[in-house]
Amino acid sequence: MITTVFVRAVLLGGLLAGVFVLSAMAEGFLFRSTIVGSNPNTVIGGVPSGGAPWTVQRGSAALNDDGRLRVEVRDLILPKLGNPGPVTNVSASLVCGGSGGTVVATTDPVPLSADGNAEIEAGIKLPDTCFGPIVLVRAAGFNGNLLPQAGPWIAATGFTSSSEHDDKDDKDRK
């Protein structure tokens, strides 16, 4: 009896994992990346970064082929304060053309929690072609007041050399 229940549980788990993988593949992702905090004096797509460094404990951005953009940040903070300071809302912008490119779409603002957590899920109009895509997380509200348009970027898609990675199988690294 216990063996039958165990076998069924394993089979159900495998089936659910397969369904998840197939649904993720069906999503048609055009772009997925981690998100890192900004440093001052950096311009991407004509948008300046904030005046102080920001950090992100965990963040990701994904854009699928029907224009659905999903951005999630956890602990997006000003390290000197340990919180997001006066920033209470954020939006996301898609830049095409790399750091020298242009902003082609920006989402509506969403709340940024006092812990620096936010989730953006929005449909954006995609251009026919987008080389070197970058997603910017931008300050969009201060002290509860929304800006008329998105402000400086405080995080963006990318990686840092200190990002955790598993290089057990990477024989070229030493």
What function would you assign to each model-found segment?
Residues 1-11:
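Bacterial N-terminal signal peptides that target proteins for export
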Residues 20-26:
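Sec/Tat signal peptide C-region and signal peptidase I cleavage site
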Residues 64-68, 97-100, 127-130:
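A short, structured loop/turn motif at beta-sheet edges
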